[in-house]
């Protein structure tokens, strides 16, 4: 139906990304296609070594999932920092990742986790890596008529450390800056590390160079500072009511420092 209606149609799930954009006239679709009645788009399941989450699964359902609590606790931690309970009851994971809003929390987490988005359209199905999905503010790799149907994440190893640290002005606000970290430790040193940054560029950021600096280290102060500098170097935040460019850049570094410390504490 979306493909038949063309570029003037938009899918509607929870509506917490699309409806505010429509109110601001940033989106002016002629048709809304409600996805609420498609049960195949909802649910959380294990598929071999992957966790698969349907696109219309709400943040409230992510918080309540025993599977995610065991396998991907960073998703629960992040969901609890999104907006407020009213929004979390309706807002969906698919809407959060597919909208392309640089202020949304889940895209950077998905980059951190190396997630893949399952996408469907009139031409069939395909998969797109989260790290290749975001092309600019509100611009993604989705073609007209395509929707994200599920998010696929490889289950991290037991004993991994994780954290999502978010600075915001008030409850329900977008991040001034935020950082997602997942790592594993071996004999007191970082064996693997992945980092995503939220709302400090036109897209979520994957801090690959910072990761490389940290692998093999004991997360000593000098190495962490070097990695933080590498992460700050890829940011390009807008100066807005959340603060000037320099402040938001430095807050990204502060959030990353905190996330690394917390992830290290949690790693076993």
For every predicted segment, state its role:
Residues 1-268:
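C-terminal structural segment of proteins
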